[in-house]
């Protein structure tokens, strides 16, 4: 016990004699409390003490040890605070300087267009639908009245995995899956990625389409025309001159392509549409004598290019921030 008292007084004196310096405090801690420190050695000597005396002596050693540690930690905390205060005092901070500008992200222009289109049709009661991007030839071609000899099946247009599976070339397969699982009336808008083996200024191997499908007992071409007029006026935010040109799509009859008159006096195609072909309705178990429907298909990148006067479709996928930041 006498040795414990002497060790405690020695430790107190050593702490009091320390000049300011965190390194010196660490050396003191190692000397007294490290693996080979004085207090550690004292605890190890307890094995030489009679068993009945060990608890009392051990408690006194721990009490003395804790006292020194409290002084050590208090001194360390005070010195760390002094060092921090000195560092802050030495730093010059001009609080009048403007803060760092927060960089704000923004939606991709293609995403902006998809949101605008979906919002317009959702407000008219259309439900958003989706389907797989890896499709079977049945949903991508057969069910849509596209026969085996149709050019769209050729290798130069379609990415095939095998004789039955492919990357979908259109979102029309969503229409088939929806009609198989729902009874009329049906109103859906189906945005999604599609794939075709083409790459130039106006084509990319992956692009986005949005398709509409409306099936009911009295769906007609007049409704279709009115819907498209209202949509184009809302999307381009101007009262555009619109024309419908007769066209051919295997899955609609009659079919039309829709053009808008631009400021340069030229007509530009924006989408395709038509009344759902009776064969397509039969393929999904809907009686074409009782129900009719119309469908609309539009390329998202095409609409985006027209709205923002972009000349090269590939710009949307090059991740050039100088280009993308214009659409925030």
UniProtKB/Swiss-Prot annotation:
UniProt-listed InterPro entries: aa-tRNA-synth_II, aa-tRNA-synth_II/BPL/LPL, Phe-tRNA-synth_IIc_asu, Phe-tRNA_ligase_II_N, Phe_tRNA_ligase_alpha1_bac, Phenylalanyl-tRNA_Synthase, tRNA-bd_arm
GO cellular component: cytoplasm
GO molecular function: ATP binding; magnesium ion binding; phenylalanine-tRNA ligase activity; tRNA binding
GO biological process, one term: phenylalanyl-tRNA aminoacylation
Cofactor: binding details: Binds 2 magnesium ions per tetramer.
Binding site for Mg(2+): 253
EC number(s) recorded for this UniProt protein: 6.1.1.20
Domain of life of the source: Bacteria
Primary location class: cytoplasm
HAMAP family cross-referenced by the UniProt entry: Phe_tRNA_synth_alpha1
Subunit structure: Tetramer of two alpha and two beta subunits.
Annotated protein name in UniProt: Phenylalanine--tRNA ligase alpha subunit
Organism of origin: Actinobacillus pleuropneumoniae serotype 3 (strain JL03)
Gene name per UniProt: pheS
């Amino acid at each position: 016990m006498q040795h414990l008292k002497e060790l405690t007084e020695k430790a107190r004196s050593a702490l009091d004699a320390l000049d300011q310096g965190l390194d010196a405090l660490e050396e003191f801690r190692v000397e007294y409390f490290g693996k080979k420190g004085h207090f550690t050695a004292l605890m190890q000597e307890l094995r030489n003490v009679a068993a009945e005396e060990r608890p009392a002596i051990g408690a006194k050693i721990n009490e003395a040890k804790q006292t020194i540690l409290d002084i050590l930690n208090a001194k360390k905390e005070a010195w760390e605070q002094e060092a921090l205060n000195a560092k802050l005092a030495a730093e010059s901070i001009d609080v009048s300087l403007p803060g760092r500008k927060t960089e704000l992200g923004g939606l991709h222009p293609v995403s902006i267009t998809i949101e605008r289109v979906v919002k317009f049709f959702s407000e008219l009661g259309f439900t958003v639908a989706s389907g797989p991007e890896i499709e079977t030839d049945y949903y991508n071609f057969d069910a849509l009245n596209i026969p085996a000899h149709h050019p769209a099946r050729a290798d130069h247009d379609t990415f095939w995995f095998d004789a039955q599976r492919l990357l979908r070339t259109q979102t029309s397969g969503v229409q088939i899956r929806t009609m198989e699982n729902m009874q009329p009336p049906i109103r859906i808008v189906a945005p999604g990625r599609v794939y075709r083996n083409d790459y130039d200024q106006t084509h990319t191997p992956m692009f986005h389409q949005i398709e509409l499908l409306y099936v009911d007992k009295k769906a007609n071409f007049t409704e279709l025309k009115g819907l498209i007029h209202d949509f184009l006026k809302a999307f381009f935010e101007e009262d555009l001159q619109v024309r419908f040109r007769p066209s051919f799509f295997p899955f609609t009859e009659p079919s039309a392509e829709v053009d808008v008159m631009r400021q340069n006096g030229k007509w530009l195609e924006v989408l395709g549409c038509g009344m759902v072909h009776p064969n397509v309705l039969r393929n999904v178990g809907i009686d074409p004598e009782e129900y009719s429907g119309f469908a609309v298909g539009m390329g998202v990148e095409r609409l985006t290019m027209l709205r923002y006067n972009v000349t090269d479709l590939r710009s949307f996928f090059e991740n050039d921030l100088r280009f993308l930041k214009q659409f925030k």
